[in-house]
Amino acid sequence: AESNVAVSLASFGDEAAFVTKLPENPVGEAALNELRRYGVDTSLVLKGGPRLGIYYFEKGTNIRPTNVVYDRAGSSISLADSSEFDWEKLLSGIDIFYFSGVTPAISDSIAKAVEEALVYCQAHHIQVVCDLNYRSKMWSHEKAQSVMKKLMHYVDLCIANDEDFESTLGIHAYDGDVAHGIDQIDSYRQGMQEIQRQYPNCKAVASVLRNVTTVE
């Protein structure tokens, strides 16, 4: 999610930098080159570790949903220690810090690194944007909530859908499911308001509403 946002911002003409850790080999360099192709600053990326984390995407058809298989065990970023990230250096001159729920789900150490980044952002008046982006194949509801509820106290703008409300924050304030989002706008609004009630530091909550009839 983070790289997609960086690419989108760079494509719109904004300055965007990406922080992660990649193996110092041709595979890691190929990933960096792909980001550079869109104008993303990769100078802050840490180098080292054994391998690049990947996932396999099975495209759905008709009413059969898509399927994702993660292969991230032993990746450079999952094995990185939080102490490797010098946030004073990495966030120098930055106005907005974006992260998704996928990143702290990678490992406990990376969750700690994200929290340290958010503490720095709050102390230095850097706005924090968080896409909750719950992924059930990466962590359980209980683990996600234990981590994300703590991180939410530093978030200025939260992006969430109905599954994120409950799975990540334990907020049950909607009816139905994401496939019928447009028909449930009032329920979504209730969920957003509850986020702001529980996390008054969060200035705005955004979501995408849609009705899904096919995955094609």
Set out the residue ranges of the language-model regions:
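Alpha-helix C-terminal capping segments
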Residues: 4-15
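Anion (oxyanion) recognition and catalysis
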Residues: 10, 36, 115, 119-123, ...
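Conserved N-terminal subdomain of the carbohydrate kinase-like
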Residues: 15-101
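Hydrophobic beta-strand scaffold residues
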Residues: 16, 42, 128-129, 159
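Active-site beta-loop-alpha junctions enriched in small/polar residues
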Residues: 73, 102, 133-137, 163, ...
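Charged helix-capping and loop-helix junction motifs
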Residues: 84-85, 111-116, 141-149
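A short helix->loop->beta-strand "cap" motif at the edges of active sites that frequently abuts
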Residues: 120-127, 199-203
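Conserved phosphate/ATP/ADP-binding segment of small-molecule kinases
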Residues: 138-216
